[in-house]
């Protein structure tokens, strides 16, 4: 198979993925079932989905607003998703969230595929 090629700053993309995974792990702390799925699908765009079995998302409308948090004071200031959304937007993509069909949350990063595949991939 061919590698999935996107134009992105590797460190900034890693920051977003780490933030989504940490949020998913935090969301599942009180769950009896703890499953975290990271799925990559490719079509016209590259789509990376982070899916958890936590309680789901109550306030989808304000989720990406700066300083919005569901965490206890001292556990987070509510900037992670706002920053992550900004990073993905800067890369020409979008970050979205929804509740999973069977519960939990699903976050999707959609990024355009690199058209010129003659470029070397970052390690």
Please give the residue ranges for each predicted region:
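Short alpha-helical Gxxx[C/S/T] motif in the catalytic ATP-binding
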Residues: 80-84
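Short beta-strand/loop element within the Bergerat-fold HATPase_c
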Residues: 33-44
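Conserved catalytic submotifs in the C-terminal HATPase_c
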Residues: 1-4, 43
């Amino acid at each position: 198979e061919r590698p999935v090629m996107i134009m992105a700053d590797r460190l900034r993309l890693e920051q977003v993925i780490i933030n989504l995974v940490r949020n998913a792990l935090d969301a599942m702390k009180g769950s009896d079932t703890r499953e975290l799925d990271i799925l990559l699908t490719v079509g016209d765009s590259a789509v990376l989905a982070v899916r958890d079995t936590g309680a789901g998302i109550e306030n989808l409308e304000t989720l990406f607003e700066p300083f919005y948090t569901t965490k206890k004071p001292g556990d987070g200031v509510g900037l992670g998703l706002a920053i992550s959304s900004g990073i993905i937007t800067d890369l020409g993509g979008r970050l979205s969230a929804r509740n999973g069909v069977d519960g939990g949350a699903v976050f999707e990063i959609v990024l355009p595929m690199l058209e010129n595949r003659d470029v070397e991939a970052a390690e």
